[in-house]
Amino acid sequence: MFNKVTKTFQYGQHSVVLETGEMARQASGAVLVSVEDTVVLATVVAAKKAKAGQDFFPLTVDYIEKTYAAGRIPGGFFKREGKPSEKETLTSRLIDRPLRPLFPEGFYNDVQVVIHTLSVNPDIDPDIPAMIGASAALAISGIPFNGPIGAARVGYVDGQYVLNPTATQLKSSKMDLVVAGTENAVLMVESEAKQLSEEIMLGGVVFGHEQMQTAINAIHDLVRDAGKPDWDWQPAPKNEALIAAVSAAAQEGLNAAYQIREKQARTTKLREVYAAVQAAMAEQAAQAGQPAPDSVGVDNILFDLEARIVRSQILNGEPRIDGRDTRTVRPISIRLGVLPRAHGSALFTRGETQALVVATLGTKQDEQIIDALMGEYRDRFMLHYNMPPFATGETGRIGVPKRREIGHGRLAKRALLPLLPAPEDFQYTIRLVSEITESNGSSSMASVCGGSLAMMDAGVPTNDHVAGVAMGLILDSGKFAVLTDILGDEDHLGDMDFKVAGTETGITALQMDIKIQGITKEIMQVALAQAREGRLHILGKMRDALEGSRTELSAFAPRMLTIKINPEKIRDVIGKGGATIRALTEETGTQIDISDDGTIVIASVDETQAKEAQRRIVELTADVEVGQIYDGSVLRLLDFGAIVQVLPGRDGLLHISEIANYRIANINDVLKVGQPVRVKVIEADDKGRLRLSIKAIGGIEQQQSGTAEPAAQSEPQAE
């Protein structure tokens, strides 16, 4: 019934099993990947024909996590998985990026790659098994694909590279780098690091590429035993006559368009050229008595012609599209404190790319609780990236963030994360929002720069500025050029784009996408060195605008006071059914967070109210000391004395003989319920019962004359 084929290989400290032939047999390709209790099923299906008029490659990659993989039932009302989580979206992008360049040019059939996570070991992230599974499923499917690819995670612990570290090992690692590629070339890198040098980062890329050959070889073995016949697919023959006609009609106009330095004017000119060429081709066909050529085909020829013009200009040493040389960063403008009510804000403009980044400070209650498959955790730092269509002068949909926005936000977050102060040094929750108001390339790196400035403007004590720069590379016939601070057009027309973010000390985030083979380690070294030069230039501009974090928080940011109490006193602060803490927060307008170790954080925009809440908590939790004097209140009268409250929840007996320096016949003659009195604690027995005295501090007659001894002041243990 089943023709099951299995391949096993050792991959770092883990054993990996590839299986096919038992599950999802009607898919074009299906592979089950198991890595020590983490199990993923990768499937691929391709349409046999491209849709009519299709002018791009419609690849869809969906990475899907099921809660049963972790032995859990989904939360919420519906009890089934809903929209993709951020982790699912990011992993889908991670898998898509190295696969997409390996499909042949002109292949426009629908291809859908779906990866289901079926079982999860909390110590082994499913993303690397998912990438290997997707590669293997494509390799055995027979679909036109210039793979397979391998993928590896690289850590850096105690000065050594670690292949596929566990989640536990990553906590002590200075690097979390994912690299994917073929036998001969690296195609994709995604990394975060704790200010590591370019040499260490590149070493991690090379190490990962060397180690992934084991996975690639195992996939080749699987293909030999279980591969389906290759598709009989050939790209459509090139219409040389049409190419020549389009080139002749468009060359002059395109050359003129790429002499225009301003983006909007250049785009307008290009649209005019495209429209004129389409009209000319239709007219020529009509004169020849032939049908008009396919408009998609004409547009593709024009795009190729654009690419040749731009690439040849750069490789020949001519100015780039906007007139710069290969190493120059666009002009930078920085404005701080743009929004008067925001806690921190920065408007970062680099050429025609602009980001308005806003920092908001919150309390522990504002932390994001993430119910991840590998375990629930709280996130105190959020970065949300938004790019509305007006940023590129277009119309479009506004609503739920797209995959690209989620990916760019995650990259910027990775870049800033290593510079955040420790929670014990800065207890605020931090949310950054990057609103891209203009875009012509490198908007994610503008978000990094703006985010660093906005946090410093808000008074977040970050250790240093973080800057990011997007780089490009053009390689042709052995000649190459590395481009600093690329434009959007250079991104589309180049062979590699990579984004590097970091401080003067080192790199904090690296993202690399390579569209061709043949980019060597030496070329990457040159590119990273040039990126460092650009990053340091930007850091200099940022320091000129703001040397370091502001020492004062915004007047609109919550103020936090921290006190430490005996953990056994927590119940006194909370009260029965939460009544005490609820009354405290409502009456003072504060937020109060209580940790199990007795640490209490009080937050309020009004510092006076925060201090009032602090005073009341200190009173609630203070220990009564023998010999101390307290301002109390008479709770009730007895024949032989009175019960007096000295602190909230603590009262004692004031005997009639300890009230005055004379004999009192009737207690009602000197005290009333609710009367404030100053008392001294003269005794506390082993059960905590208190004996009080007014006579010991001069008697009731002194208090009535206004010459009583002052009461003790409770000192809060503020941190």
UniProtKB/Swiss-Prot annotation:
NCBIfam families: polynuc_phos, PRK11824.1. The gene is pnp. One of its GO terms (molecular function) is RNA binding. InterPro entries: ExoRNase_PH_dom1 (IPR001247), ExoRNase_PH_dom2 (IPR015847), ExoRNase_PH_dom2_sf (IPR036345), KH_dom (IPR004087), KH_dom_type_1 (IPR004088), KH_dom_type_1_sf (IPR036612), NA-bd_OB-fold (IPR012340), PNPase (IPR012162). This is Polyribonucleotide nucleotidyltransferase. It is an enzyme of class 2 (transferase). Mg(2+) binds at residues 491, 497. Its cofactor is Mg(2+). Residues 558-617 form the KH domain.
